[in-house]
């Protein structure tokens, strides 16, 4: 059993797309794998209201598009509530009193339950790695406590090299393994895409797991084949967390 944490260099860099690719790639190797997004929060474009009797989130009566994508990416029979601990209708509970509702004990229990049920859990964070999570701790603090290996998603755009290298430095300071990184093309008009990826390959001391091109509705597509270094994930699954 193992968990991987999918960290992004920023918000809207494609963490959910990369998590879907990881889930599909691992399933292609026969691994029983699910996604897990502890805290889901976003704007109007990615939440959907549900009737109160159908509410699957802990507090607000909404479901989140990222959690739905994770739910529909796995072949395992999971519900929305199985793979999400908290859903909020606004973009950042850490900026409001809602942050007081988030309890790490619940998140830890939910992750333990998934780890005990499935061979692998792909955990998707919210916003960036240093974003406050709950009870005075950041996502970085939490994954260090969990000793959870990290896969870094880099949304390839101007400025991403600085963001990526700073995030890598934080991961190294945490003392958790950086399994590798995924290049996600989020700007189809970026003329120097290849040069940026080459520069990141040169400076990130971890393997490139794959390159996901700019895609229309990636949440509806097969993405696993874009991860060309899946052996790295399979190896780490057995080496780091049993």
Swiss-Prot record:
Keyword set includes Nucleotide-binding: yes
Task: Cite the EC number.
Answer: 6.3.3.3
So what does this thing catalyse?
A: (7R,8S)-7,8-diammoniononanoate + CO2 + ATP = (4R,5S)-dethiobiotin + ADP + phosphate + 3 H(+)
Q: Which GO terms describe its molecular function?
A: ATP binding; dethiobiotin synthase activity; magnesium ion binding
Q: Which domain of life is it from?
A: Bacteria
Which Pfam families does the protein's record reference?
A: AAA_26
Q: Which cofactor does it need?
A: Mg(2+)
Key words of the record: ATP-binding, Biotin biosynthesis, Cytoplasm, Ligase, Magnesium, Metal-binding, Nucleotide-binding
Q: Which gene encodes it?
A: bioD1
Upper classification of the source organism reads: Bacteria, Pseudomonadati, Pseudomonadota, Gammaproteobacteria, Pasteurellales
Q: What is this protein called?
A: ATP-dependent dethiobiotin synthetase BioD 1
Name one process (GO BP) from the record.
biotin biosynthetic process
Record function comment:
Catalyzes a mechanistically unusual reaction, the ATP-dependent insertion of CO2 between the N7 and N8 nitrogen atoms of 7,8-diaminopelargonic acid (DAPA, also called 7,8-diammoniononanoate) to form a ureido ring.
């Amino acid at each position: 059993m193992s968990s991987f944490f999918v960290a992004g260099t920023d918000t809207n860099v494609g963490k959910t797309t990369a998590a879907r690719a990881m889930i599909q790639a691992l399933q292609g190797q026969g691994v029983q794998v699910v996604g897990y997004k502890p805290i889901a929060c976003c704007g109007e474009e990615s939440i959907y209201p549900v009737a109160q009797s159908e509410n699957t989130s802990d507090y607000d009566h909404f479901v989140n598009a990222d959690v739905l994508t994770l739910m529909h990416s796995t072949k395992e029979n999971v519900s929305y509530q199985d793979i999400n601990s908290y859903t909020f209708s606004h973009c950042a509970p850490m900026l409001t009193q809602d942050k007081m509702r988030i309890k790490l004990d619940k998140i830890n229990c939910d992750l333990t339950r998934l780890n005990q049920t499935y061979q692998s859990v792909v955990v998707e964070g919210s916003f960036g790695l240093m974003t406050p999570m709950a009870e005075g701790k950041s996502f970085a603090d939490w994954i260090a406590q969990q000793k959870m290996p990290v896969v870094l998603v880099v949304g390839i755009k101007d400025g991403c090299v600085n963001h990526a290298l700073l995030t890598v430095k934080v991961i190294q300071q945490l003392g958790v393994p950086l399994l590798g990184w995924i290049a996600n093309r989020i700007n189809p008009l970026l003329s120097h895409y290849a040069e940026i990826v080459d520069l990141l390959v040169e400076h990130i001391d971890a393997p490139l797991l794959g390159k996901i091109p700019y895609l229309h509705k990636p949440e509806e597509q097969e993405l696993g084949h874009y991860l060309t270094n899946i052996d790295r994930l399979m190896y780490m699954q057995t080496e780091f967390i049993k």
